[in-house]
Amino acid sequence: MADSTTMEHDGRGTKRKREADGGSGQGVGKGNSNAVKEGYGPNITEMVPRNIFNKGNHTIYHVVKTQKYLDFNYVTNQNPYIIPYQTAGFWGSMWDQTDIGNNQSINIMKALNAVALGVTWIKGEITFEVYSVTRQRLLTGTTNQTTWDFETSQNMFIADADREPENFNLETVAATGPLAQQTTQTLLFNSHNDRYTKYELPQRNQYTREINFQQLTNNYMWRPLDISKETNFRSLIPMSEGVYTKSENLRQTEFTYETTTYATSGATTRQTLFRNRTSYPRMHIAQPQVPDETGFMKFRYQVRMSTKLHLNFHMYPDYATNNNLEYMHRQTILLPQVAETNGIVACMPYEINTQ
């Protein structure tokens, strides 16, 4: 039969046999679920009762991409460079505005920010590729004339401070970039080297680091932010050390709270949320410690760095007005920030999960 039902004859007349799993098999307006039914006859379908327009969970997945060619120069200072991936601006090329207007993945992010209620930060990816290594050395037989040699066999070091907490300053836009700061410790190979886990990256190879961001609970979302705009350089990636206040250089609290005015009513929303701590150790790019006649060999690495930031934008529902937006904004939380003066980013290598 063309219908969803079948006809059988058992000698006592005709009976109708129905399917057993809801839909037309359970009759009009009935079924195994609690959803309301809509439609007619055997083609009846389920409908979520409190979301008639099915727009309350509309999301758009987007990846913000950047690619930079970097010059890690250790001629004058052999200390490791700090990769400040804990800053939100690192992922949006905030530190390098060159041709940023032509980066369509950033432009799409800005457009989605304008129509999104909140954002879920999923994960970030950082890929390094070494395409050239040179070494500065003294010319043979001289004491003050230098030259450059290609070092095709020399690897670059990537290191994590995953043994104890570290930090770095965040007082300028430039500090969100990978070439702005070097450590104050002497090297990765000194008496304190046990603080770092080191990896070697050969030339013509790629190394990708994946960072899983702090996930919010209870339907909370992060508030949309233009991570390419220079005035937002104090904002950090989702982390559970709490909101960093103006009154102290570094305030760490188990609770994140804020007071923000929304909508024309002037009503104030207050949000409090408990989250588990998340590990974001400080990351470094370094050269090896190899003695020579000038102290230590001085290398220079040309590196291609690519980043991918995976975001999920939660769109405003249809027929959103000031009254209900104020209610929904109670589910959005500002990204953590450092203080306006003497801002410090804490790089915690510990993860404590109490679940």
UniProtKB/Swiss-Prot annotation:
GO cellular component, one term: T=1 icosahedral viral capsid
Function: Capsid protein self-assembles to form an icosahedral capsid with a T=1 symmetry, about 22 nm in diameter, and consisting of 60 copies of size variants of the capsid proteins, which differ in the N-terminushe capsid encapsulates the genomic ssDNA. Capsid proteins are responsible for the attachment to host cell receptors. This attachment induces virion internalization predominantly through clathrin-dependent endocytosis.
Similarity-based family: Belongs to the parvoviridae capsid protein family.
Gene: VP
Coiled coil: none
Keyword Repressor set for record: no
Protein name: Capsid protein VP1/VP2
Major location category of this protein: virion
Domain of life, per lineage: Viruses
Entry keyword set: Capsid protein, Clathrin-mediated endocytosis of virus by host, Host-virus interaction, T=1 icosahedral capsid protein, Viral attachment to host cell, Viral penetration into host cytoplasm, Viral penetration via permeabilization of host membrane, Virion, Virus endocytosis by host, Virus entry into host cell
Compositionally biased region (Basic and acidic residues): 1-21
Cellular compartment(s): Virion
Transmembrane segments: none
Region listing for Disordered, in residue ranges: 1-41
